[in-house]
């Protein structure tokens, strides 16, 4: 799909396939009204006012057969998401009826939209920039209200405004430096230019570094904390997973080795999406299937943001327990002493002091796990500050890091006394990198790749 403004009319089903109360088939483009009218029996859609909902029936124009009773929303350019004429046909939910209407629209001249093409048109037509387009998908994929709050702020343009303002300031600085270089007749112009460049570069770097400090929190809220639940067999890992999920997703029995693979689930812990990985018990085993699960568990431990190490408080520490304590000591780890409802035999003096005694059976102290996670990753601060702008997208984070590196190169050059005109190159590069975030300077291949990750109909 070429990166140009496209004027053909596209269509797609915008609701999930399957049974439901309603289904929505969307059209966008110059001929959206004419194509919709060709299959609609009711008011003349080409003559109704913009942003109205119109009752009628979808019919097969060849046979006159009624396909469904519908409500049709008409929205005229440019006051639409794509800045093109948009029609949304609200049908009864169901695979057959929505597909039948989609095929009718295609036969009448619409083209099947590619994934993300509606949002791509909004970007190409200047309705949203790249950060706002990405925020659309973040809202769809948000697993908690906090993640949704960050995505909505980004869609509203908070990150775009910050980036655009910074780019404009960089441009102003480059222009001033250029003027000073072009008019060197003043004796102190070189000193003035160096001082200006040093002051502004440090200002830009400070701003971007402050933005990067939000990345850890933002990325966690967007993508979730990858959390490995580890422990030797039969200490209560799967029961803990089920307790956190509040539903039976892992197999729980009294037979060691029941969880023979890695089970992944998401759970909302005070607004933080935890990607819980219930690992097979880590122990030496001759069972090939279970051995594969154990190896995957070790890998999950290495790749996790957080480790929940479950020990059995009703038994003495084993060599396997000690091995797991050593294996996880460099991780963000929470030690959980399970089965405290039974007589305790575990040697507490051999454990770090920050363990949490719990009973999955009686639900004792489960809430303390949530508090400890907040302490570990958010320093007990609020998860989302209302007026703050957060970085949460890995692409944005990477580009901001590159921009900071370019600014550091300017500062290093100033310290070495390099000519100002050479330092302009790195400052210009910073301006270009920031433009990639909003899409002002993003390569065509990147734009195509980003929108291809969207769902159909969006």
UniProtKB/Swiss-Prot annotation:
GTP binds at residues 234-239, 253-259, 278-281. K(+) binds at residues 234, 253, 255, 258. The keyword Cytoplasm applies. Its main location: cytoplasm. Its cofactor is K(+). It is found in: Cytoplasm. Mg(2+) binds at residues 238, 259. HAMAP family: GTPase_MnmE. Belongs to the TRAFAC class TrmE-Era-EngA-EngB-Septin-like GTPase superfamily. TrmE GTPase family. Homodimer. Heterotetramer of two MnmE and two MnmG subunits. Exhibits a very high intrinsic GTPase hydrolysis rate. Involved in the addition of a carboxymethylaminomethyl (cmnm) group at the wobble position (U34) of certain tRNAs, forming tRNA-cmnm(5)s(2)U34. This is tRNA modification GTPase MnmE. The lineage of its organism: Bacteria, Bacillati, Bacillota, Bacilli, Lactobacillales. The gene is mnmE.
């Amino acid at each position: 799909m070429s990166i140009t403004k496209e004027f053909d009319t596209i269509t797609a089903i915008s609701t999930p396939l399957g049974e439901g109360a309603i289904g929505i088939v969307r059209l966008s483009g110059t001929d959206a009204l004419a194509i919709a009218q060709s299959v609609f029996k009711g008011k003349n859609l080409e003559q109704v006012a913009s942003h109205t909902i119109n009752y009628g029936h979808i019919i097969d124009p060849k046979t006159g057969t009624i396909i469904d009773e519908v409500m049709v929303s008409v929205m005229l350019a440019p006051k639409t998401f794509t800045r093109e004429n948009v029609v949304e046909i609200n049908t009864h939910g169901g695979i057959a009826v929505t597909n039948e209407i989609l095929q009718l629209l295609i036969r009448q001249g619409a083209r099947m939209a590619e994934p993300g093409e509606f949002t791509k048109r909004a970007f190409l037509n200047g309705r949203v920039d790249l950060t706002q387009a990405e925020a659309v998908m973040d809202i769809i994929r948000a697993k908690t209200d906090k993640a949704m709050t960050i995505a909505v702020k980004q869609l509203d343009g908070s990150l775009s405004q910050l980036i655009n303002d910074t780019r404009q300031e960089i441009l102003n600085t480059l222009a001033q430096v250029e003027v000073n270089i072009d008019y060197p007749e003043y004796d102190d112009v070189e000193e003035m230019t160096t001082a200006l460049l040093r002051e502004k570069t440090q200002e830009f770097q400070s701003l971007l570094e402050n933005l990067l400090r939000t990345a850890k929190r933002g990325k966690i809220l967007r993508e979730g904390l990858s959390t490995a639940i580890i422990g030797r067999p039969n200490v209560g890992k799967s029961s803990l997973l089920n307790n956190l999920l509040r539903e039976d997703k892992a197999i729980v029995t009294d037979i060691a080795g029941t969880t023979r693979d890695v089970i992944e689930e998401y759970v909302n812990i005070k607004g933080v999406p935890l990607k819980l990985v219930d690992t097979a018990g880590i122990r030496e085993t001759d069972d090939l299937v279970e051995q594969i699960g154990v190896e995957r568990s070790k890998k999950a431990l290495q790749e996790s943001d957080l480790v929940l190490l479950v020990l059995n408080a009703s038994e003495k520490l084993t060599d396997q327990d000690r091995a797991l304590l050593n294996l996880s000591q460099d991780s963000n780890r929470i030690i959980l002493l399970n089965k405290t409802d039974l007589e305790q035999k575990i040697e507490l003096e051999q454990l770090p002091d920050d363990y949490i005694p719990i009973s999955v059976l009686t639900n004792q102290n489960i809430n303390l796990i949530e508090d400890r996670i907040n302490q570990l990753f958010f320093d007990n601060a609020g998860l989302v500050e209302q007026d703050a702008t957060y970085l949460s997208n890995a692409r944005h984070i990477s580009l901001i890091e590159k921009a900071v590196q370019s600014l550091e190169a300017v500062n290093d050059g100033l310290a070495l006394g390099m000519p100002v005109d050479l330092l302009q190159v790195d400052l210009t590069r910073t301006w270009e990198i920031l433009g990639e975030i909003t899409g002002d300077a993003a390569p065509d291949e990147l734009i195509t790749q980003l929108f291809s990750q969207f769902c159909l109909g969006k």
